[in-house]
Amino acid sequence: MSILSLVEDRPTPKEVYNWKIYLLAAVASCTSCMIGYDSAFIGTTISLQSFKDEFDWDSMSAAHQDLVSSNIVSLYQAGAFFGAFFAYPIGHFWGRKWGLMVSALIFTLGAGIMLGTNGDRGFGLLYGGRVLAGLGVGAGSNITPIYISELSPPAIRGRLVGVYELGWQIGGLVGFWICYGVDETLPPSHKQWIIPFAVQLIPSGLLIIGALFLKESPRWLFLRGRREEAIKNLCWIRQLPEDHVYMIEEIGAIDQTLEHQRATIGLGFWKPFAAAWTNKKILYRLFLGSMLFFWQNGSGINAINYYSPTVFKSIGVTGSNTSLFTTGIFGVVKTVVTFIWLLWLIDRVGRRLLLLIGAAGGSICLWIVGAYIKIARPSERENKQMDGGGIAAMFFFYLWTVFYTPSWNGTPWVINSEMFDPNIRSLAQACAAGSNWLWNFLISRFTPQMFAKMDYGVYFFFASLMILSIIFVFFLIPETKGIPLESMDRLFETQPIWRAHGTLLKQIREDEERFRHDLEDSGFVKSTDRQVEVVDA
Protein backbone atom coordinates (compact mmCIF):
# COMPACT_ATOMS: atom_id res chain seq x y z
CA MET A 1 0.00 0.00 0.00
CA SER A 2 1.45 3.39 -0.99
CA ILE A 3 1.34 6.50 1.17
CA LEU A 4 -1.30 7.93 -1.21
CA SER A 5 -3.72 4.98 -0.98
CA LEU A 6 -7.17 5.36 0.56
CA VAL A 7 -7.51 3.44 3.82
CA GLU A 8 -10.79 1.49 4.14
CA ASP A 9 -11.81 -0.11 7.43
CA ARG A 10 -13.70 -2.82 5.49
CA PRO A 11 -14.65 -3.65 1.85
CA THR A 12 -16.80 -0.73 0.72
CA PRO A 13 -19.26 -0.87 -2.23
CA LYS A 14 -18.62 1.77 -4.87
CA GLU A 15 -22.19 3.05 -4.42
CA VAL A 16 -21.18 4.49 -1.04
CA TYR A 17 -18.86 7.01 -2.73
CA ASN A 18 -21.68 8.78 -4.58
CA TRP A 19 -22.44 12.35 -5.65
CA LYS A 20 -25.16 12.87 -3.04
CA ILE A 21 -22.76 12.82 -0.12
CA TYR A 22 -20.50 15.37 -1.82
CA LEU A 23 -23.51 17.60 -2.54
CA LEU A 24 -24.65 17.50 1.10
CA ALA A 25 -21.13 18.40 2.24
CA ALA A 26 -20.93 21.26 -0.28
CA VAL A 27 -24.26 22.78 0.79
CA ALA A 28 -23.36 22.56 4.49
CA SER A 29 -19.99 24.15 3.72
CA CYS A 30 -21.63 27.42 2.71
CA THR A 31 -21.11 28.07 6.43
CA SER A 32 -17.36 28.04 5.94
CA CYS A 33 -17.68 30.29 2.88
CA MET A 34 -19.26 32.82 5.25
CA ILE A 35 -16.38 32.43 7.70
CA GLY A 36 -13.65 32.50 5.06
CA TYR A 37 -15.02 35.55 3.29
CA ASP A 38 -15.46 37.47 6.53
CA SER A 39 -11.97 36.68 7.79
CA ALA A 40 -10.44 37.83 4.49
CA PHE A 41 -12.34 40.94 3.46
CA ILE A 42 -12.47 42.86 6.73
CA GLY A 43 -8.78 43.73 7.11
CA THR A 44 -8.39 44.93 3.54
CA THR A 45 -11.72 46.79 3.55
CA ILE A 46 -10.87 48.93 6.57
CA SER A 47 -7.53 49.72 4.90
CA LEU A 48 -9.31 51.26 1.87
CA GLN A 49 -8.82 55.03 1.70
CA SER A 50 -12.56 55.54 1.11
CA PHE A 51 -13.33 53.85 4.44
CA LYS A 52 -10.69 55.92 6.23
CA ASP A 53 -11.95 59.15 4.71
CA GLU A 54 -15.58 58.50 5.68
CA PHE A 55 -14.66 57.85 9.31
CA ASP A 56 -12.02 60.61 9.52
CA TRP A 57 -9.30 58.06 10.19
CA ASP A 58 -6.39 60.48 9.89
CA SER A 59 -7.66 62.57 12.80
CA MET A 60 -7.22 59.61 15.16
CA SER A 61 -3.97 58.88 16.96
CA ALA A 62 -2.06 55.75 15.94
CA ALA A 63 -3.11 54.03 19.17
CA HIS A 64 -6.77 54.93 18.54
CA GLN A 65 -6.55 53.59 14.99
CA ASP A 66 -5.16 50.29 16.29
CA LEU A 67 -7.95 50.14 18.89
CA VAL A 68 -10.75 50.75 16.38
CA SER A 69 -9.39 48.31 13.79
CA SER A 70 -8.85 45.59 16.40
CA ASN A 71 -12.37 46.17 17.76
CA ILE A 72 -13.92 45.84 14.28
CA VAL A 73 -12.07 42.59 13.69
CA SER A 74 -12.19 41.01 17.15
CA LEU A 75 -15.88 41.60 18.02
CA TYR A 76 -16.67 39.08 15.30
CA GLN A 77 -14.50 36.47 17.04
CA ALA A 78 -16.06 37.31 20.41
CA GLY A 79 -19.51 36.65 18.95
CA ALA A 80 -18.26 33.44 17.34
CA PHE A 81 -16.92 32.18 20.68
CA PHE A 82 -20.37 32.40 22.26
CA GLY A 83 -22.03 31.17 19.07
CA ALA A 84 -20.02 27.94 19.22
CA PHE A 85 -21.56 27.10 22.61
CA PHE A 86 -24.98 28.47 21.65
CA ALA A 87 -25.03 25.83 18.90
CA TYR A 88 -24.85 22.95 21.36
CA PRO A 89 -28.52 23.03 22.51
CA ILE A 90 -29.67 23.78 18.95
CA GLY A 91 -27.73 20.85 17.51
CA HIS A 92 -28.87 18.54 20.32
CA PHE A 93 -32.60 19.31 20.28
CA TRP A 94 -33.28 20.60 16.76
CA GLY A 95 -30.70 18.63 14.83
CA ARG A 96 -27.85 19.43 12.48
CA LYS A 97 -30.02 20.53 9.55
CA TRP A 98 -32.01 23.17 11.44
CA GLY A 99 -28.92 24.21 13.37
CA LEU A 100 -27.33 25.18 10.05
CA MET A 101 -30.45 27.12 9.13
CA VAL A 102 -30.40 29.08 12.40
CA SER A 103 -26.71 29.94 12.00
CA ALA A 104 -27.35 31.27 8.48
CA LEU A 105 -30.31 33.39 9.61
CA ILE A 106 -28.37 34.98 12.48
CA PHE A 107 -25.40 35.71 10.21
CA THR A 108 -27.69 37.26 7.59
CA LEU A 109 -29.23 39.54 10.23
CA GLY A 110 -25.78 40.67 11.34
CA ALA A 111 -24.59 41.28 7.78
CA GLY A 112 -27.74 43.30 7.05
CA ILE A 113 -27.18 45.50 10.10
CA MET A 114 -23.63 46.26 8.96
CA LEU A 115 -24.99 47.70 5.72
CA GLY A 116 -26.53 50.55 7.73
CA THR A 117 -23.08 51.78 8.78
CA ASN A 118 -21.88 55.18 7.57
CA GLY A 119 -19.73 58.05 8.76
CA ASP A 120 -22.61 59.94 10.37
CA ARG A 121 -23.78 56.95 12.44
CA GLY A 122 -20.28 55.97 13.51
CA PHE A 123 -19.16 52.44 14.29
CA GLY A 124 -22.13 51.30 16.43
CA LEU A 125 -24.02 49.39 13.71
CA LEU A 126 -20.77 47.91 12.43
CA TYR A 127 -19.83 46.67 15.89
CA GLY A 128 -23.30 45.23 16.55
CA GLY A 129 -23.50 43.54 13.15
CA ARG A 130 -20.05 42.01 13.62
CA VAL A 131 -21.11 40.45 16.93
CA LEU A 132 -24.29 38.96 15.41
CA ALA A 133 -22.45 37.69 12.34
CA GLY A 134 -19.93 36.11 14.71
CA LEU A 135 -22.71 34.36 16.63
CA GLY A 136 -23.93 32.87 13.35
CA VAL A 137 -20.58 31.61 12.12
CA GLY A 138 -19.64 30.36 15.59
CA ALA A 139 -22.74 28.19 15.58
CA GLY A 140 -22.01 27.03 12.05
CA SER A 141 -18.39 26.19 12.89
CA ASN A 142 -19.72 23.83 15.56
CA ILE A 143 -22.45 22.11 13.58
CA THR A 144 -21.03 21.83 10.04
CA PRO A 145 -17.99 19.58 10.71
CA ILE A 146 -20.16 17.32 12.91
CA TYR A 147 -22.86 17.06 10.26
CA ILE A 148 -20.41 16.19 7.50
CA SER A 149 -18.44 13.68 9.59
CA GLU A 150 -21.66 11.90 10.64
CA LEU A 151 -22.59 11.40 6.97
CA SER A 152 -19.17 10.27 5.79
CA PRO A 153 -17.77 6.79 5.06
CA PRO A 154 -14.49 6.37 7.00
CA ALA A 155 -12.24 6.20 3.93
CA ILE A 156 -13.27 9.65 2.64
CA ARG A 157 -14.31 11.33 5.90
CA GLY A 158 -11.26 13.59 5.85
CA ARG A 159 -11.97 14.59 2.26
CA LEU A 160 -15.62 15.38 2.97
CA VAL A 161 -14.93 17.35 6.15
CA GLY A 162 -12.21 18.95 4.04
CA VAL A 163 -14.94 20.37 1.79
CA TYR A 164 -15.71 22.57 4.81
CA GLU A 165 -12.12 23.85 4.70
CA LEU A 166 -12.33 24.29 0.93
CA GLY A 167 -15.41 26.48 1.38
CA TRP A 168 -13.42 28.53 3.88
CA GLN A 169 -10.64 29.09 1.34
CA ILE A 170 -12.98 29.89 -1.55
CA GLY A 171 -14.72 32.46 0.62
CA GLY A 172 -11.33 33.79 1.65
CA LEU A 173 -10.16 34.00 -1.96
CA VAL A 174 -13.16 36.14 -2.87
CA GLY A 175 -12.66 38.23 0.26
CA PHE A 176 -8.99 38.89 -0.47
CA TRP A 177 -9.60 39.90 -4.09
CA ILE A 178 -12.81 41.89 -3.76
CA CYS A 179 -11.08 44.87 -2.18
CA TYR A 180 -8.48 44.85 -4.92
CA GLY A 181 -11.35 44.82 -7.41
CA VAL A 182 -13.29 47.74 -5.92
CA ASP A 183 -10.05 49.69 -5.44
CA GLU A 184 -9.23 49.23 -9.14
CA THR A 185 -12.69 49.81 -10.63
CA LEU A 186 -14.54 52.25 -8.36
CA PRO A 187 -13.64 55.78 -7.27
CA PRO A 188 -13.24 56.33 -3.50
CA SER A 189 -16.77 56.56 -2.10
CA HIS A 190 -19.20 55.01 0.39
CA LYS A 191 -20.18 52.52 -2.33
CA GLN A 192 -16.58 51.37 -2.76
CA TRP A 193 -16.18 50.06 0.78
CA ILE A 194 -19.80 49.00 1.48
CA ILE A 195 -19.91 46.54 -1.46
CA PRO A 196 -17.54 44.06 0.27
CA PHE A 197 -19.86 44.14 3.30
CA ALA A 198 -22.89 43.42 1.10
CA VAL A 199 -21.26 40.36 -0.51
CA GLN A 200 -21.50 38.60 2.89
CA LEU A 201 -25.20 38.03 2.14
CA ILE A 202 -24.47 35.72 -0.82
CA PRO A 203 -23.11 32.62 1.01
CA SER A 204 -25.60 32.99 3.87
CA GLY A 205 -28.47 33.24 1.38
CA LEU A 206 -27.25 30.11 -0.41
CA LEU A 207 -27.11 28.24 2.90
CA ILE A 208 -30.64 29.30 3.86
CA ILE A 209 -31.97 27.95 0.56
CA GLY A 210 -29.78 24.83 0.57
CA ALA A 211 -30.58 23.89 4.18
CA LEU A 212 -34.22 23.38 3.21
CA PHE A 213 -33.16 20.42 1.05
CA LEU A 214 -30.54 18.83 3.33
CA LYS A 215 -31.05 15.36 4.78
CA GLU A 216 -30.87 15.22 8.57
CA SER A 217 -27.88 13.36 10.01
CA PRO A 218 -28.79 9.66 10.44
CA ARG A 219 -26.60 9.40 13.54
CA TRP A 220 -28.45 12.30 15.19
CA LEU A 221 -31.77 10.64 14.32
CA PHE A 222 -30.59 7.37 15.91
CA LEU A 223 -29.55 9.37 18.97
CA ARG A 224 -33.05 10.90 19.23
CA GLY A 225 -34.78 7.52 18.84
CA ARG A 226 -36.11 8.19 15.31
CA ARG A 227 -34.83 4.87 14.00
CA GLU A 228 -36.94 4.40 10.86
CA GLU A 229 -36.17 7.89 9.58
CA ALA A 230 -32.49 7.38 10.42
CA ILE A 231 -32.26 4.15 8.42
CA LYS A 232 -34.15 5.72 5.51
CA ASN A 233 -31.76 8.69 5.40
CA LEU A 234 -28.70 6.47 5.75
CA CYS A 235 -29.83 4.23 2.88
CA TRP A 236 -30.47 7.32 0.72
CA ILE A 237 -27.01 8.70 1.47
CA ARG A 238 -25.21 5.37 0.99
CA GLN A 239 -27.30 4.39 -2.08
CA LEU A 240 -27.68 0.86 -0.67
CA PRO A 241 -30.68 -1.17 0.55
CA GLU A 242 -31.19 -1.73 4.25
CA ASP A 243 -30.39 -5.46 4.04
CA HIS A 244 -27.02 -4.99 2.32
CA VAL A 245 -24.22 -6.37 4.51
CA TYR A 246 -22.47 -2.97 4.55
CA MET A 247 -25.64 -1.35 5.92
CA ILE A 248 -26.13 -4.14 8.45
CA GLU A 249 -22.59 -3.58 9.72
CA GLU A 250 -22.93 0.21 9.90
CA ILE A 251 -26.35 0.20 11.58
CA GLY A 252 -25.15 -2.48 13.99
CA ALA A 253 -22.07 -0.43 14.88
CA ILE A 254 -24.21 2.67 15.53
CA ASP A 255 -26.62 0.67 17.70
CA GLN A 256 -23.76 -0.88 19.65
CA THR A 257 -22.14 2.52 20.26
CA LEU A 258 -25.39 4.11 21.42
CA GLU A 259 -26.08 1.20 23.75
CA HIS A 260 -22.60 1.55 25.21
CA GLN A 261 -23.16 5.28 25.71
CA ARG A 262 -26.54 4.69 27.30
CA ALA A 263 -24.89 2.40 29.83
CA THR A 264 -21.90 4.69 30.50
CA ILE A 265 -22.34 8.40 29.69
CA GLY A 266 -26.10 8.51 29.10
CA LEU A 267 -27.97 10.10 26.19
CA GLY A 268 -29.53 13.20 27.79
CA PHE A 269 -28.71 16.87 27.23
CA TRP A 270 -26.79 17.30 30.50
CA LYS A 271 -25.10 13.89 30.51
CA PRO A 272 -22.10 14.97 28.39
CA PHE A 273 -21.37 17.83 30.83
CA ALA A 274 -21.22 15.39 33.73
CA ALA A 275 -19.11 12.97 31.70
CA ALA A 276 -16.71 15.72 30.67
CA TRP A 277 -15.93 16.49 34.30
CA THR A 278 -16.00 12.98 35.73
CA ASN A 279 -14.58 10.87 32.88
CA LYS A 280 -10.85 11.53 32.57
CA LYS A 281 -10.69 9.99 29.09
CA ILE A 282 -13.28 12.42 27.73
CA LEU A 283 -11.74 15.38 29.53
CA TYR A 284 -8.34 14.47 28.13
CA ARG A 285 -9.69 14.28 24.58
CA LEU A 286 -11.43 17.64 25.02
CA PHE A 287 -8.07 19.04 26.06
CA LEU A 288 -6.39 17.59 22.95
CA GLY A 289 -9.06 18.95 20.61
CA SER A 290 -8.96 22.43 22.12
CA MET A 291 -5.16 22.53 22.11
CA LEU A 292 -5.06 21.74 18.40
CA PHE A 293 -6.68 25.13 17.82
CA PHE A 294 -4.23 26.81 20.17
CA TRP A 295 -1.38 25.51 18.02
CA GLN A 296 -3.27 26.38 14.83
CA ASN A 297 -3.63 30.01 15.89
CA GLY A 298 -0.08 29.90 17.23
CA SER A 299 1.11 29.52 13.65
CA GLY A 300 0.19 33.17 13.04
CA ILE A 301 -2.44 32.46 10.41
CA ASN A 302 -5.10 34.79 11.76
CA ALA A 303 -2.66 37.62 12.30
CA ILE A 304 -2.03 37.34 8.55
CA ASN A 305 -5.68 36.82 7.54
CA TYR A 306 -6.99 39.83 9.42
CA TYR A 307 -4.05 42.20 9.10
CA SER A 308 -2.44 41.17 5.82
CA PRO A 309 -1.63 44.78 4.77
CA THR A 310 0.32 45.21 8.04
CA VAL A 311 2.13 41.91 7.51
CA PHE A 312 3.18 42.71 3.95
CA LYS A 313 4.22 46.24 4.96
CA SER A 314 6.56 44.74 7.58
CA ILE A 315 8.27 42.71 4.83
CA GLY A 316 8.68 45.80 2.65
CA VAL A 317 5.60 45.83 0.39
CA THR A 318 4.53 49.46 -0.14
CA GLY A 319 1.44 51.07 -1.68
CA SER A 320 -2.14 50.13 -0.82
CA ASN A 321 -2.86 48.69 -4.27
CA THR A 322 0.29 46.54 -4.24
CA SER A 323 -0.56 45.35 -0.73
CA LEU A 324 -4.06 44.35 -1.84
CA PHE A 325 -2.59 42.47 -4.83
CA THR A 326 -0.06 40.52 -2.73
CA THR A 327 -2.86 39.69 -0.29
CA GLY A 328 -4.90 38.35 -3.21
CA ILE A 329 -2.00 36.13 -4.28
CA PHE A 330 -1.86 34.82 -0.70
CA GLY A 331 -5.53 33.83 -1.09
CA VAL A 332 -4.85 32.10 -4.42
CA VAL A 333 -1.99 30.05 -2.96
CA LYS A 334 -4.13 28.94 -0.01
CA THR A 335 -7.02 27.92 -2.25
CA VAL A 336 -4.88 25.94 -4.71
CA VAL A 337 -3.07 24.09 -1.92
CA THR A 338 -6.40 23.37 -0.21
CA PHE A 339 -7.60 21.59 -3.36
CA ILE A 340 -4.45 19.43 -3.27
CA TRP A 341 -4.98 18.72 0.45
CA LEU A 342 -8.62 17.81 -0.13
CA LEU A 343 -8.18 15.54 -3.15
CA TRP A 344 -4.88 13.79 -2.44
CA LEU A 345 -3.49 14.37 1.04
CA ILE A 346 -5.93 14.32 3.97
CA ASP A 347 -7.25 10.76 3.46
CA ARG A 348 -4.04 9.37 1.98
CA VAL A 349 -1.10 10.92 3.84
CA GLY A 350 -3.27 11.26 6.94
CA ARG A 351 -3.85 13.87 9.62
CA ARG A 352 -0.89 13.30 11.93
CA LEU A 353 1.92 13.32 9.35
CA LEU A 354 0.53 16.45 7.70
CA LEU A 355 0.54 18.31 11.03
CA LEU A 356 4.15 17.30 11.70
CA ILE A 357 5.42 18.27 8.24
CA GLY A 358 3.47 21.54 8.21
CA ALA A 359 4.77 22.64 11.60
CA ALA A 360 8.40 21.86 10.77
CA GLY A 361 8.40 23.51 7.34
CA GLY A 362 6.30 26.48 8.43
CA SER A 363 8.54 27.21 11.40
CA ILE A 364 11.68 27.33 9.24
CA CYS A 365 10.00 29.78 6.85
CA LEU A 366 8.94 32.15 9.65
CA TRP A 367 12.45 32.13 11.16
CA ILE A 368 13.84 33.19 7.76
CA VAL A 369 11.26 35.97 7.25
CA GLY A 370 11.84 37.31 10.76
CA ALA A 371 15.62 37.21 10.31
CA TYR A 372 15.34 39.21 7.07
CA ILE A 373 13.25 41.91 8.76
CA LYS A 374 15.69 42.07 11.71
CA ILE A 375 18.73 42.49 9.46
CA ALA A 376 17.36 44.54 6.55
CA ARG A 377 14.83 46.73 8.43
CA PRO A 378 12.77 47.27 5.22
CA SER A 379 10.26 49.62 6.86
CA GLU A 380 13.06 52.08 7.75
CA ARG A 381 14.69 52.29 4.31
CA GLU A 382 14.31 55.47 2.27
CA ASN A 383 14.41 53.45 -0.95
CA LYS A 384 11.06 51.65 -0.97
CA GLN A 385 11.99 49.43 -3.93
CA MET A 386 12.01 45.79 -2.80
CA ASP A 387 15.50 44.27 -3.09
CA GLY A 388 16.56 40.66 -3.59
CA GLY A 389 16.33 39.95 0.12
CA GLY A 390 12.77 41.24 0.19
CA ILE A 391 11.82 39.07 -2.76
CA ALA A 392 13.35 36.06 -0.99
CA ALA A 393 11.38 36.93 2.16
CA MET A 394 8.18 37.05 0.12
CA PHE A 395 9.06 33.65 -1.37
CA PHE A 396 9.46 32.13 2.10
CA PHE A 397 6.23 33.77 3.23
CA TYR A 398 4.35 32.07 0.38
CA LEU A 399 6.28 28.85 1.08
CA TRP A 400 5.04 29.10 4.69
CA THR A 401 1.53 29.28 3.20
CA VAL A 402 2.22 26.08 1.24
CA PHE A 403 3.34 24.28 4.41
CA TYR A 404 0.60 25.65 6.66
CA THR A 405 -2.48 25.31 4.46
CA PRO A 406 -2.51 21.51 3.88
CA SER A 407 -1.65 20.83 7.51
CA TRP A 408 -2.82 23.14 10.27
CA ASN A 409 -5.47 25.08 8.36
CA GLY A 410 -8.18 22.42 8.07
CA THR A 411 -6.82 19.29 9.72
CA PRO A 412 -7.71 20.27 13.33
CA TRP A 413 -11.35 20.62 12.23
CA VAL A 414 -11.25 17.14 10.69
CA ILE A 415 -9.76 15.54 13.79
CA ASN A 416 -12.18 17.25 16.18
CA SER A 417 -15.18 16.24 14.10
CA GLU A 418 -14.32 12.54 14.33
CA MET A 419 -12.66 11.85 17.69
CA PHE A 420 -15.73 11.78 19.99
CA ASP A 421 -18.72 9.50 20.63
CA PRO A 422 -22.11 10.61 19.22
CA ASN A 423 -23.67 11.97 22.42
CA ILE A 424 -20.56 13.91 23.44
CA ARG A 425 -19.79 15.05 19.88
CA SER A 426 -21.86 18.27 19.89
CA LEU A 427 -20.46 19.43 23.23
CA ALA A 428 -16.94 18.46 22.21
CA GLN A 429 -17.20 20.33 18.93
CA ALA A 430 -18.58 23.34 20.82
CA CYS A 431 -15.51 23.28 23.07
CA ALA A 432 -13.17 22.89 20.09
CA ALA A 433 -14.85 25.64 18.08
CA GLY A 434 -14.96 27.83 21.18
CA SER A 435 -11.24 27.28 21.65
CA ASN A 436 -10.63 28.24 18.03
CA TRP A 437 -12.59 31.46 18.36
CA LEU A 438 -11.04 32.32 21.74
CA TRP A 439 -7.50 32.15 20.38
CA ASN A 440 -8.72 33.77 17.18
CA PHE A 441 -10.10 36.67 19.25
CA LEU A 442 -6.89 37.11 21.23
CA ILE A 443 -4.72 37.07 18.10
CA SER A 444 -6.96 39.48 16.18
CA ARG A 445 -7.35 41.78 19.20
CA PHE A 446 -3.65 42.20 19.91
CA THR A 447 -1.91 41.73 16.54
CA PRO A 448 -1.65 45.50 15.83
CA GLN A 449 -0.07 46.04 19.24
CA MET A 450 2.25 43.04 18.75
CA PHE A 451 3.59 44.42 15.46
CA ALA A 452 3.99 47.87 17.03
CA LYS A 453 6.00 46.56 20.00
CA MET A 454 7.71 43.37 18.75
CA ASP A 455 8.37 44.07 15.04
CA TYR A 456 10.34 41.09 13.64
CA GLY A 457 9.89 39.32 16.98
CA VAL A 458 6.30 38.50 15.97
CA TYR A 459 7.63 36.07 13.35
CA PHE A 460 10.06 34.47 15.84
CA PHE A 461 7.21 34.13 18.34
CA PHE A 462 4.96 32.23 15.92
CA ALA A 463 7.91 30.16 14.61
CA SER A 464 8.70 29.03 18.17
CA LEU A 465 5.10 27.96 18.77
CA MET A 466 5.15 25.90 15.58
CA ILE A 467 8.22 24.01 16.84
CA LEU A 468 6.48 23.24 20.14
CA SER A 469 3.43 21.94 18.27
CA ILE A 470 5.59 19.17 16.74
CA ILE A 471 6.24 17.73 20.20
CA PHE A 472 2.54 17.94 21.08
CA VAL A 473 1.38 16.13 17.95
CA PHE A 474 4.04 13.42 17.96
CA PHE A 475 3.40 12.25 21.51
CA LEU A 476 -0.33 12.95 21.94
CA ILE A 477 -2.26 12.86 18.62
CA PRO A 478 -2.93 9.46 16.96
CA GLU A 479 -3.63 9.03 13.26
CA THR A 480 -7.42 8.86 12.63
CA LYS A 481 -7.67 8.28 8.86
CA GLY A 482 -9.86 5.31 7.92
CA ILE A 483 -10.94 4.62 11.52
CA PRO A 484 -14.75 4.33 11.98
CA LEU A 485 -16.30 6.92 14.30
CA GLU A 486 -17.50 4.09 16.52
CA SER A 487 -13.90 2.90 17.09
CA MET A 488 -12.35 6.18 18.26
CA ASP A 489 -12.37 5.12 21.93
CA ARG A 490 -10.24 2.11 21.06
CA LEU A 491 -7.86 4.28 19.03
CA PHE A 492 -7.09 6.64 21.89
CA GLU A 493 -6.65 3.73 24.29
CA THR A 494 -4.06 2.02 22.05
CA GLN A 495 -0.43 2.66 22.97
CA PRO A 496 2.01 3.92 21.90
CA ILE A 497 0.20 6.78 20.16
CA TRP A 498 2.54 6.86 17.17
CA ARG A 499 1.68 3.21 16.36
CA ALA A 500 -1.99 3.22 17.41
CA HIS A 501 -3.43 3.61 13.91
CA GLY A 502 -1.78 0.55 12.37
CA THR A 503 -2.44 -1.60 15.43
CA LEU A 504 -6.15 -0.76 15.61
CA LEU A 505 -6.79 -0.96 11.87
CA LYS A 506 -5.44 -4.50 11.88
CA GLN A 507 -7.79 -5.42 14.75
CA ILE A 508 -10.80 -3.83 12.99
CA ARG A 509 -10.17 -5.79 9.80
CA GLU A 510 -9.86 -9.03 11.76
CA ASP A 511 -13.15 -8.26 13.55
CA GLU A 512 -14.84 -7.48 10.22
CA GLU A 513 -13.66 -10.77 8.68
CA ARG A 514 -15.07 -12.71 11.63
CA PHE A 515 -18.37 -10.82 11.38
CA ARG A 516 -18.82 -11.59 7.68
CA HIS A 517 -17.86 -15.22 8.22
CA ASP A 518 -20.44 -15.54 11.01
CA LEU A 519 -23.04 -13.76 8.84
CA GLU A 520 -22.54 -16.20 5.97
CA ASP A 521 -22.72 -19.16 8.37
CA SER A 522 -26.05 -17.84 9.67
CA GLY A 523 -27.70 -17.88 6.23
CA PHE A 524 -26.54 -14.87 4.22
CA VAL A 525 -24.81 -15.30 0.84
CA LYS A 526 -23.44 -12.77 -1.58
CA SER A 527 -25.23 -11.75 -4.75
CA THR A 528 -24.03 -9.27 -7.32
CA ASP A 529 -25.59 -6.12 -5.90
CA ARG A 530 -26.88 -6.97 -2.44
CA GLN A 531 -27.02 -9.53 0.33
CA VAL A 532 -29.97 -11.97 0.26
CA GLU A 533 -31.13 -14.21 3.08
CA VAL A 534 -31.32 -17.94 2.32
CA VAL A 535 -34.66 -19.47 3.38
CA ASP A 536 -34.99 -23.26 3.45
CA ALA A 537 -38.09 -24.58 1.68
Swiss-Prot record:
Give residue ranges on the Cytoplasmic side.
Answer: 1-22, 96-97, 152-159, 215-285, 347-352, 409-456
Which Gene3D superfamilies does the record associate with it? MFS general substrate transporter like domains
Tell me the Gene Ontology biological-process terms attached to this UniProt entry. Answer: quinate metabolic process
Keywords of the record: Cell membrane, Membrane, Quinate metabolism, Transmembrane, Transmembrane helix, Transport, Ubl conjugation
> Which GO molecular function entries does the Swiss-Prot or TrEMBL record give?
carbohydrate:proton symporter activity
Q: Which residues lie on this side of the membrane: Extracellular?
A: 44-74, 119-130, 181-193, 307-325, 374-387, 478-537
Which InterPro entries would you find in this protein's record?
A: MFS_dom (IPR020846), MFS_sugar_transport-like (IPR005828), MFS_Sugar_Transporters (IPR050360), MFS_trans_sf (IPR036259), Sugar/inositol_transpt (IPR003663), Sugar_transporter_CS (IPR005829)
* Post-translational modification as stated in the protein's UniProt record: Ubiquitinated. Deubiquitinated by creB, probably to control its activity or amount.
Q: Main location per UniProt?
A: membrane
UniProt-annotated location(s): Cell membrane
Residues annotated as transmembrane: 23-43, 75-95, 98-118, 131-151, 160-180, 194-214, 286-306, 326-346, 353-373, 388-408, 457-477
Its GO CC terms are: plasma membrane
| Free-text function comment from the UniProt entry | Integral membrane transporter that imports quinic acid to be catabolized as a carbon source.
- Write the protein's name: Probable quinate permease
